[in-house]
Amino acid sequence: MSKRTEQLTELLAPVVEDLGFVLWGVEYIQGRGAVLRVFIDHADGISVDDCAAVSHEVSGVLDVEDPIPGEFNLEVSSPGMDRPMFDITQYVDYIGEDVQLKLLAPVSGKRKMTAAIVAVDGDTLVVELDGETLRVPYSQVDRARLQPRFN
């Protein structure tokens, strides 16, 4: 997680939580047409009205604090079924599910894989790929997204 993303998460988490939601994660994409994506979650799901309420409050905080120079688009949404993963603690609730990983350095010769989440062991993600158990240091995870199964 970049320093800016960490700062935005720290700034926005209390706002989102005060509205009764969980801040699932924050993505900031720089450049022309910059985008700040705020993912919110709730045990009862997320509605369009929920996103609008959070967007309104987050916009106010961003206007006052001004943590991002220049113009950007704010997007507030549910993380969805194929949710991006932002923190190692989020994996615990999805043990047994598949996750698509993009790694900074190869593990067992692979930088990209879809594997089943077996466990979280401190700062290590334990996954199973083709019958082999792999220990992936979380510091090596560049991107991760749940891969829902449809039976």
Swiss-Prot record:
Localization, per the record, is: Cytoplasm
Tell me the leader sequence span. none
Is Cytoplasm tagged as a keyword? yes
Which biological processes are named by the entry's GO terms? ribosomal small subunit assembly; translation
Give the top-rank taxon of the lineage listed in the UniProt record for this protein: Bacteria
InterPro entries, sorted = Ribosome_maturation_RimP, RimP_C, RimP_C_sf, RimP_N, RimP_N_sf
Which key words are in the record? Answer: Cytoplasm, Ribosome biogenesis
Does the record's keyword annotation contain Cytoplasm? yes
One Pfam family name is: DUF150_C
Q: Which GO CC terms are listed, alphabetically?
A: cytosol
Tell me its family.
Belongs to the RimP family.
Role description: Required for maturation of 30S ribosomal subunits.
What NCBIfam families is this protein classified in? PRK00092.1-1 (NF000927)
What name appears for this protein in its UniProt entry?
Ribosome maturation factor RimP
Give the species. Alcanivorax borkumensis (strain ATCC 700651 / DSM 11573 / NCIMB 13689 / SK2)
